[in-house]
């Protein structure tokens, strides 16, 4: 082992109650295992990460610090941690990776406390960067890396996506507090998180996965899935699984072997899925879905018209949404349908159409969960040449929406409240106060009329109170100013899937 250790940090983005295994940094740790010392710090466990990071850096020499950063609320704690490290240990390189620096590498590198950005899948890039740091060699040929050359920012060619089967498995046994991550959910009493596939071959206009993976999908072998989940179940007592895959059901022929594995493990599970893919599955495959104990699938319905779906480049049709709702009800699966509202072309018209489609879905499958977001344009990353010669990316986004503001140039600017709301799909610059209020009122009525099954904390009596209070408003479509529901929610706390989900 080389002397320089690596500290991998997951800044706070949630609460200890909702913390899942920090897979992004654990996958990086996997390529370091046996090669050099490493440790992780997870802000979601309630730690003072900046203080803990300084203590670890003081205890032994470190080759670098890696920080994973998502757009939105994780940027601010990432800034604070990186600033503290830079002040106390100015010679230790700081590397940012994850969605934020992949989508906005220039903004990340404009910060004086960020030395390198790892774009996209980071395992091989980090390992290669560490070799160069150890040797004092140049980094110009490290694929997937962005860096500073004097006063200029350099974007090296993109790195080809690597299949999970070619990478070492996650070192779960090295996580000293793994019990803190096996938490109760509506799936089970000890729910684990897992990722078996990377990327998505579709290019929906509003989705950041497009920029991260550029239409690529790589799948894990079924046997590796069996071994990993079997270890989590048999060694640590995990009894349910929340998949972080961007699109678990890529194709029917690849899904069937995975369903056979999950059927043998008998651990209830949740995943992301597409309506058109599931709607096209055979009756035999749907029987396998039932036997696998899939409890809920997060399905991007997105819009109420085929025209709107075409504008979004979704690649599916409204009929697929209704077909998959019917199939899910037949086979005991709860669909969690997400909708993207308020696109710049016809924000108000799309919203009213979507409300009516949601009502039809709730009639077809009353247990269906509904998640509402506002439209955000996809932030395409800069066109660095692809190391694998793959197709070029879509044009880089320079402004936020038509005639919208220019994108922020630093991490600090990205923490301004309006930008956090926009990138988290909670608002958009072209929306009027009336539209925002209309959506908020509808969402409140809908959530009270049909309380989410994901919240095990709320009592049966509490659910009944909310349902009955909202019943007349939902029946008469009187969504405006539901003051009594706002008051009731002060006393009856209800989980919001679009914020907390699992």
Where are the language model's segments positioned?
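Glycine-rich beta-alpha loop elements in corrinoid/cobalamin-binding modules
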Residues: 31-164, 377-380
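Radical SAM [4Fe-4S] cluster-binding motif and immediate context
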Residues: 165, 172-335, 356
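Flexible glycine/acidic-rich beta-alpha junction loops that bind and position SAM and/or redox cofactors
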Residues: 15-16, 104-105, 202, 253, ...
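Catalytic cores of alpha/beta
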Residues: 105-110, 345-359
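Radical SAM enzyme core and accessory elements
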Residues: 2-11, 17, 58-60, 91, ...
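A short, glycine/small-residue-rich beta-strand->loop->alpha-helix junction that serves as a flexible
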Residues: 13-23, 70-75
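Structural motif
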Residues: 5, 63-64, 116, 240-242
């Amino acid at each position: 082992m080389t002397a320089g250790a690596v500290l991998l940090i997951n800044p706070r983005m949630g609460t200890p109650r909702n913390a899942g295994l920090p897979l992004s940094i654990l996958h990086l740790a996997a390529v370091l295992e046996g090669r050099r010392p490493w440790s992780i710090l997870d802000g979601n466990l309630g730690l003072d990460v900046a203080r803990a990071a300084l203590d670890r850096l003081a205890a032994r020499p470190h080759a670098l610090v890696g920080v994973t950063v998502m757009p939105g609320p994780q940027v601010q704690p990432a800034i604070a941690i990186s600033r503290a490290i830079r002040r106390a240990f100015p010679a230790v390189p700081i590397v940012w990776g994850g969605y934020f620096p992949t989508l906005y590498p220039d903004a990340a590198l404009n910060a004086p406390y960020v030395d390198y950005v790892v774009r996209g899948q980071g395992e091989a890039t980090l390992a290669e960067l560490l070799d160069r740091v150890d040797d004092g060699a140049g980094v110009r040929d490290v694929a997937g890396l962005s860096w500073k050359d004097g006063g200029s920012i350099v974007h090296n060619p993109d790195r080809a996506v690597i299949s999970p089967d070619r990478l070492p498995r996650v070192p779960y046994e090295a996580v000293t507090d793994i019990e803190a991550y096996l938490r109760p959910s509506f799936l089970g009493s000890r729910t684990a998180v897992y990722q078996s596939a990377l990327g998505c071959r579709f290019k929906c206009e509003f989705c950041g996965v497009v920029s991260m993976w550029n239409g690529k999908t790589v799948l894990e072998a079924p046997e590796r899935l069996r071994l990993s989940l079997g270890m989590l179940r048999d060694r640590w007592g995990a009894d349910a699984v929340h998949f972080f895959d961007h699109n678990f059901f890529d194709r029917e022929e690849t899904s069937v072997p995975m369903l056979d594995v999950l059927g043998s493990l008998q651990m209830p599970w949740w995943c992301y899925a597409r309506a058109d893919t599931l709607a096209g599955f055979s009756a035999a495959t749907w029987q396998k879905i039932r036997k696998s104990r899939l409890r809920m699938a997060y399905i991007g319905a997105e819009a109420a018209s085929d025209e709107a779906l075409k504008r979004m480049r979704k690649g599916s049709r409204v009929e697929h949404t209704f077909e998959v709702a019917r199939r899910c009800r037949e086979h005991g699966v709860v669909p969690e349908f997400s909708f993207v509202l308020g696109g710049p072309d016809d924000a108000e018209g799309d919203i009213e159409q979507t409300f009516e489609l949601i009502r039809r879905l709730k009639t077809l499958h009353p247990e269906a969960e509904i998640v509402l977001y506002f439209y955000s344009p996809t932030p395409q990353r800069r066109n660095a040449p692809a190391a694998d010669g793959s197709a070029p990316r879509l044009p880089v986004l320079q402004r936020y929406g038509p005639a919208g503001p220019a994108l922020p140039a630093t991490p600090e600017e990205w923490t301004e409240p309006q930008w956090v709301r926009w990138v988290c799909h909670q608002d958009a610059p072209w929306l009027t106060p009336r539209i925002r209020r209309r959506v908020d009122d509808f969402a409140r009525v809908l959530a009270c009329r049909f309380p989410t099954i994901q919240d095990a904390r709320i009592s049966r009596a509490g659910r009944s109170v909310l349902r009955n209070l909202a019943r007349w408003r939902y029946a008469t479509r009187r969504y405006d100013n539901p003051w009594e529901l706002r008051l009731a929610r002060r006393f009856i706390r209800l989980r919001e899937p679009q914020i907390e989900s699992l």
